[in-house]
């Protein structure tokens, strides 16, 4: 199995262990909503653009609501477990495009409420999570009021985004990815002027 496939399987296992109306870190979405999002992203090519393009967002939301309301929970989750269909561009892009998607949304369920801890990850998974950090940071922090530098505890710089005084975000690749994706539930340390750090946090365009 690829890292993306393992992360998908882990996500599905966690989603099966909670009720579909359980909360997530995605504001306004429960687990069923999040599952419908994953299905629409991979299986409804007509609606997927609205996930990233605001002009199409209303249509995407309507399709997602329809998919969520009309599909049995086990069937909905089964479609996520099955992965992208043959006609989906994600079939070929799965090893690249879905590592971050599956990791982030799995943690969106795991990290709700107090007491969460990062999952132990093998070296292959940690390595696979390094690459998406730069892409995510460019998407969410391109207008940041600071030069935001993402570093591992070992001193490797994985991404830089924004302009201005430096703010350093330090953590393991998965934690950096969660922070870049707009989640406050990330085990990172942030070095910079306190007011600037708060402005950087608010500047993130969460996905």
What residues fall within each predicted segment?
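An N-terminal domain-cap segment
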Residues: 1-50
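Structured surface interface patches that mediate subunit assembly and partner/cofactor docking
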Residues: 3, 17-21, 44-59, 75-207
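Generic alpha-helical scaffold signal
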Residues: 5, 25-28, 67-70, 96-99
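C-terminal end-helix/capping segment
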Residues: 57-70
